[in-house]
């Protein structure tokens, strides 16, 4: 049975648990515990990680209430284990399963799955790929919390393949999430080194224990990331509880991270609410993304390279935002910006970009002034499909960008303006600074070059650079007055709510409809006579 089949079967088991009140997120947490136990069993590593009496067969041999009680005891015991990595994975873990039949069904079904491909058993990487598939499934179903900003795997793959991590390079993700960037970086290095077999023993040990470092603020997410790393044979620094540390990048934890040769990350979007920015940055700001940008510049080794997913506001925000962009273009060679399409994150409407840069320059890694000369921009946003479940974002959508980016990880491959994928030639051009004195044919290209001097004089150091006109865009001058727009929107909402109310009553949910109507009346301060 291949991994896709196993992922589908494991996910299907969730239906039984959901009937018992277990959410998708909690189900993934349950699977994280059970999959670790099963992985140790199938790969013959139980003695390496698990104490006697707390292994897969010990859980499987019990039934009913005894099995559920033992499972609870097992989680507590492993969370206090002498092995720091096991302790980190199971620290403060508890189960949301309340009925013995649920854990019995889960264990027996997992045990009955065909974990083998022909005569070959599953490797740790096989279990890791399977686990990543489950995380992807969870992101598809969980459109709030961490799930809404789950970085699409095709984008992660492209970023890592362009950065080209090498053996003995430290790769850092200061907003690790479920460790997707680190896992892909490890996968890339293994693909270039015959699964590390071409490396000497000391370098192999470096790759397993020191090459990949992440920091994650949320304990539950950090646990998922640790499990992901461990299942991919990335153990990390055992003194720090594995490859993913728990802490706040915008505080002292971020300052204590070791310097990196590569940073690949997707910092959390949104305001600074809930995030305690206690670190002193050169340009103090409450904008989380701008603080992360400063951290990345600081944490890179001279000559190190980075790719960072940022929302549009990082490109144009004034004040400290302008200062930080100037700092970036001074201290780093910002060579490439990829404008991403909307809809590729589960938070619909989020507009994002990827900034690719090198600290200093390749010629002089310690250079800290005037490092940026030309910035190349690829527009993968304008007039692209609305991506989502029905139109998935795939590797093919990124291939034209990969081709023009070139083979050099610092963006120094020979480049030529002009790339017309996805019917770009049919696109109208905007009346903007970007298109002044520009050949009409080139103005329809998705791939353009802009000088540092032009960015300074024409854009006042804004990096919000676009030149193609969206066919669905509306001229602001032709819009109605704001109060008219607001009234129209309110009218459409009232109509939609009325139709939903009628539908709920037709479906026999009158009590729920009455409750929702009451909540609406309370929200608007009651109905006025």
Swiss-Prot record:
Keywords: DNA-binding, Host-virus interaction, Methyltransferase, Restriction system, S-adenosyl-L-methionine, Transferase
Catalytic activity: a 2'-deoxyadenosine in DNA + S-adenosyl-L-methionine = an N(6)-methyl-2'-deoxyadenosine in DNA + S-adenosyl-L-homocysteine + H(+)
Binding site for S-adenosyl-L-methionine: 148-153, 178-180, 216
Protein's GO biological process: DNA restriction-modification system; methylation
TM region positions: none
PROSITE patterns: N6_MTASE (PS00092)
InterPro entries linked: D12N6_MeTrfase_N (IPR022749), DNA_Adenine_Mtase (IPR051537), DNA_methylase_A-5 (IPR003356), DNA_methylase_N6_adenine_CS (IPR002052), SAM-dependent_MTases_sf (IPR029063), T1MK-like_N_sf (IPR038333)
The keyword DNA-binding appears for this protein: yes
Classification via Pfam families: HsdM_N, N6_Mtase
Gene Ontology terms, MF aspect: DNA binding; N-methyltransferase activity; site-specific DNA-methyltransferase (adenine-specific) activity
UniProt keyword Metal-binding, yes or no: no
Induction: Encoded in the hsd locus, in the order hsdR-hsdM-hsdS. There is a promoter upstream of hsdR and another between hsdR and hsdM. This probably allows expression of the methylase enzyme before the restriction-specific subunit.
Domain of life, per lineage: Bacteria
Any one GO cellular component localisation term in the record: type I site-specific deoxyribonuclease complex
Entry's family note: Belongs to the N(4)/N(6)-methyltransferase family.
Misc remark: Type I restriction and modification enzymes are complex, multifunctional systems which require ATP, S-adenosyl methionine and Mg(2+) as cofactors and, in addition to their endonucleolytic and methylase activities, are potent DNA-dependent ATPases.
Subunit and interaction comment: The type I restriction/modification system is composed of three polypeptides R, M and S. The restriction enzyme has stoichiometry R(2)M(2)S(1). The methyltransferase is composed of M(2)S(1).
Record's function text: The subtype gamma methyltransferase (M) subunit of a type I restriction enzyme. In the presence of the R subunit the complex can also act as an endonuclease, binding to the same target sequence but cutting the DNA some distance from this site. Whether the DNA is cut or modified depends on the methylation state of the target sequence. When the target site is unmodified, the DNA is cut.
This protein's name: Type I restriction enzyme EcoKI methylase subunit
Designated gene of the protein: hsdM
């Amino acid at each position: 049975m291949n991994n896709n089949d196993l992922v589908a079967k494991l996910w299907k088991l969730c239906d039984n648990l959901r009937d018992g009140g277990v959410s998708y997120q909690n189900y993934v947490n349950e699977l994280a515990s059970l999959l670790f136990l099963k992985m140790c069993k199938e790969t013959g590593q139980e003695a390496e990680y698990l104490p006697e009496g707390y292994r897969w067969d010990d859980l499987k041999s019990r039934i009913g209430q005894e099995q559920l009680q033992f499972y609870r005891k097992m989680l507590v015991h492993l969370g206090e284990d002498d092995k720091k990595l096991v302790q980190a994975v199971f620290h403060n873990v508890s189960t949301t399963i309340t009925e013995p039949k649920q854990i019995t069904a889960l264990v027996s079904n997992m045990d009955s799955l065909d974990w083998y491909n022909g005569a070959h058993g599953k490797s740790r990487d096989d279990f890791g790929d399977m686990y990543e598939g489950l995380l992807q499934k969870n992101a598809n179903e969980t459109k709030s919390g961490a799930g809404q900003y789950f970085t699409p795997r095709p984008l992660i793959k492209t970023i890592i393949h362009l950065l080209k991590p090498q053996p003995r390079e430290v790769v850092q993700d200061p907003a690790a999430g479920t460790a997707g960037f680190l896992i892909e970086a490890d996968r890339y290095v293994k693909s270039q080194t015959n699964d590390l077999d071409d490396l000497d023993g000391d370098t192999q040990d470096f790759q397993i224990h020191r090459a990949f470092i992440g920091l994650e603020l949320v304990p539950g997410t950090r646990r998922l990331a640790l499990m992901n790393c461990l299942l991919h044979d990335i153990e990390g620094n055992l003194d720090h509880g594995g490859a993913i540390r728990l802490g706040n990048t915008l505080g002292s934890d971020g300052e204590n991270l070791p310097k990196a040769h590569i940073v690949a990350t997707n910092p959390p979007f949104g305001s600074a609410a809930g995030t305690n920015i206690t670190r002193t940055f050169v340009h103090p700001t409450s904008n989380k993304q701008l603080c992360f940008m400063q951290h990345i510049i600081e944490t890179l080794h001279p000559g190190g390279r980075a790719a960072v997913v940022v929302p549009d506001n990082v490109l144009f925000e004034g004040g400290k935002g302008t200062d930080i962009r100037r700092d970036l273009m001074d201290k780093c060679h910002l060579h490439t910006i990829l404008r991403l399409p909307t809809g590729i994150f589960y938070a619909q409407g989020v507009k994002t970009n990827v900034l690719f840069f090198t600290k200093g320059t390749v010629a002089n890694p310690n250079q800290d002034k005037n490092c940026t000369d030309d910035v190349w921009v690829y527009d993968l946003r304008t007039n692209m499909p609305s991506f989502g479940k029905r139109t998935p974002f795939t590797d093919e959508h990124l291939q034209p960008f990969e081709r023009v980016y070139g083979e050099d990880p610092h963006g120094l491959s020979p480049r030529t303006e002009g790339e017309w994928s996805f019917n770009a030639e049919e696109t109208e051009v905007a009346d903007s600074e970007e298109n002044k004195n520009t050949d009409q044919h080139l103005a329809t290209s998705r791939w353009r070059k802009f000088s540092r001097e032009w960015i300074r004089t024409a854009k006042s150091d804004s990096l919000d650079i676009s030149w193609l006109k969206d066919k669905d865009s509306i001229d602001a001058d032709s819009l109605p007055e704001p109060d008219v727009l607001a009234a129209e929107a309110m009218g459409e909402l009232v109509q939609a709510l009325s139709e939903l109310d009628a539908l709920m009553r037709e479906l026999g949910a009158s009590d729920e409809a009455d409750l929702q109507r009451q909540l609406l009346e309370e929200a608007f301060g009651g109905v006025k006579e």
